Amino acid sequence: MMGQSDAGEDIYEIETSLKIETALKIETELEIETAPSASDVEFLYARITESNLAATGLPAAERISAWVRNDSGEIEAGIYGWSWGGTAEVDLLWVSESRRSAGIGSALLTAFESEAIARRCSQIVLSTFDFQAPEFYERRGYTSLGRVDDYPAGGWHTTMRKLI
């Protein structure tokens, strides 16, 4: 719903479904989705990649992943991320409970780091929560760049970096 402030400025109220009226009085529908389609997400990635290329001249990010599978082909551990512009980013690192403390997480991270070096990256960044063993990354040379407290409630989140 739109209104005006005492100064005559447009004010917008955010709802899960709303209409946005611009200064040109063009009406646009906006809906919050909790399960967007893969094609919609890929559309956004393609548009941001185009924008990034136009702004930086750098090609699209290249994905990096490694997996540990059991004899049945089920994933028991994996790492996923990408490299772009001389930096690699770990998006996901997970090891099943039954395979933890066996060095698999370290092996996956080392493989990711080696691939980042091969791609001539100078640093690796990642984000983690207090309950996701940030000390695991600290032991491997990652340092915190900053912390967001109470995310999630009662916990904290940090972004970490390692120069390679």
Would you name each region that the model predicts?
Residues 44, 137, 142:
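Conserved active-site tyrosine of GNAT-family acetyltransferases
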Residues 108, 132-133:
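Conserved short alpha-helix immediately C-terminal to the canonical SAM/SAH-binding motif I
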Residues 116-130:
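Conserved GNAT acetyl-CoA-binding A-motif
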Residues 91, 99-100, 123, 136:
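Acidic/histidine-enriched, beta-strand-rich ligand/metal-binding domains
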